[in-house]
Amino acid sequence: MVIKSALKLISDAYAPSVLTLSTFESGTRAEESTQRAAGVTRDKNVNPFISLYEDVLLPSEQWEDYGLVGISIVGISQILPGLTLARTLKEKYPHLHVTLGGPIFSVNAKQLLDHPEFFDEFCHSVVTFEGEEPLHRLLTALKQGTALKEVPNLLFCEDGKVTLNEERVELRFEELPAPTFEGLPMDLYLSPYPILPVLQSRGCYWGKCTFCTHSFVYGHRYGKQRTKQMVDELEGLAEKYQTKYFTFSDEAVSPHSLNDVSEEIIKRGLDMKSLALLKFEKVMDEQLFQKMRQAGFIFLMYGLE
C-alpha cells in the first residue's frame, strides 16, 4: 500500500499521467502518433521520466565509453518511457548510436517508412523481429564503418529517406546462448528473491488466432529448446543468481513441453518455483497438473480464446 500510495502521489503531480508498478499512461494518447509522442517526451509537466533520467540515470554511467545503446520496447505502456530515454540519450550524447527494438516496432515497421522525423527525434536505427544476429551485424557495421543496408531486419534513415532492409535472419534455438543478467541490480527489484524470465520456446505452437500478433513477430515460426537444455539453463541460472524463482515468458508453453520439463526437474530433484502462460487444451489432465506442481509450477496463467 505504501508503494501504491507513493505512485498515486507521483501520478497526481504529473496528471493526467498515471504511473503504477507495471504500467504508465500519459492520458494524452501520445502513443498513437510520432508527433504526439515527441511532444510528451519533452513535457516535464506530464512525463516523470524526463527528470528521472536526467537526475538519476545519466549521472550513473560513463556514457562516453559506449558506442551503441539498445532499447527494447515490448508493450504499449513502455512506449513513452522508452522513447523518452532514446530522445534523451540521442540529444545528450551525439556520439551514441541509439537503436530501438521490440514487438512494437516489428508490427509497425512499414508505418515508419513514411516518418523520417521519428529517426531525427528518437534514434538512428530500429531492429525488427528477432534481434540477436541483426544486433551483432549492426555492431560490426558501426565498428568497421560499413553500410547499414547490409544489416538484416534493420530500419534506418539516411538523407531524409527511411530504408527497411527486407532480409530476415533468425537463429535456431540451439544457436542461442542462455540468458545473462550481468550488470542488473538484482537487489533493487521489489521482490524478496530474484525472479528470472526464461524462454522454453519462441512463437506459438498453435499460432492460428487471427487477433494475435505474437506469431507475426516471430514470423509465424515456432521453435523450442530441448528438455535437457532447458533444465540445464534453469539449474545454471538458479546457482548463478541464488534463486529458485522463474517466469516462463513463452507466449504459451505446450502441454508436451510442460510434461517433459516437469519430469526432468523432478528427476534431478531441483527445488524451483515457476510461473507459466498456457492455453487451454483437452490433454491437460489431473496427472499432468500434479506432475507440474511437484516440479514447482505454482502459478499458471491461461489465455481463453
Residue locations for each model-derived region?
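Conserved SAM/AdoMet-binding glycine-rich loop
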Residues: 68, 95, 99, 231-305
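N-terminal [4Fe-4S]-dependent radical SAM core
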Residues: 42, 157-198
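Glycine-rich beta-alpha loop elements in corrinoid/cobalamin-binding modules
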Residues: 26-166
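Conserved, mostly hydrophobic/aromatic
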Residues: 154, 204, 230, 248
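Canonical Radical SAM [4Fe-4S] cluster-binding loop centered on the CxxxCxxC motif
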Residues: 191-228
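Extended, charge-rich helix/loop segments that form flexible
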Residues: 1-43
